[in-house]
Amino acid sequence: MTVPFFERSEQAITELARKHGNAVARVARNILGNEQDTEECVNDTYLGTWKAIPPNRPSPLRTFVCKIARNLATMKYHANTAEKRNSHYDVALNELEDCFSDGKSIEDEYDAKELSDAINSFLATLNYTDRFIFTRRYWYSDPLQDIAKMANTTTNSVTVRLFRIREKLKHYLVKEGLLV
């Protein structure tokens, strides 16, 4: 799928939108909660992907594109909500905050790559359902009700599982020496 990007073919963006457009839009929409901002973010994601390939050769492409969308949506979200906080995205971030620090930002305390590797290793220890729930909540920023429907369970069950997963994550990070 990255070949058209290397050839600088105009079809690259069309194919990207066809194959991964829904996922990109969902990531942006879950963070921004606004169709106009979502559409702008999706278009910026396509442009960012066009600029990033080449030189990057992402595999898998979907993860690469969703990461660009997530970063752009997060920046736009923070710009839009500098004064007000309370969306489900803030709630999801606040849930994870206790796993990482005592008020300092993650960037101040840890090398992002090391933390990312540790979280990926932790996720590999989880069963499929827990990994799915954690990823849908903290990567895709899905609302709890949507996750419950996708996992064929109750919202309360998802909430309890996320709490237990966060506790396991805290213990894992302490064991790995990344959290004191």
Tell where the protein language model's regions lie, with residue ranges.
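Acidic, proline/glycine-rich intrinsically disordered inter-domain spacer in sigma factors
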Residues: 94-124
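DNA-recognition helix of helix-turn-helix
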Residues: 74, 119, 130, 139, ...
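Structural recognition of an alpha-helix C-terminal capping motif at a helix-to-coil junction
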Residues: 40-47, 51, 59-71
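Amphipathic, Lys/Arg- and hydrophobic-enriched alpha-helical face
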Residues: 16-35, 50-52, 123, 175
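Arg/Lys-rich amphipathic alpha helix in sigma70-family domain 2
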Residues: 67-89, 112, 175
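N-terminal module of bacterial RNA polymerase sigma factors
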Residues: 1-23, 30, 107, 140, ...
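Short alpha-helical "packing" element that flanks the helix-turn-helix/winged-helix DNA-binding module
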Residues: 133-134
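Amphipathic alpha-helical recognition patches that constitute DNA-binding helices
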Residues: 12-15, 23, 27, 37, ...
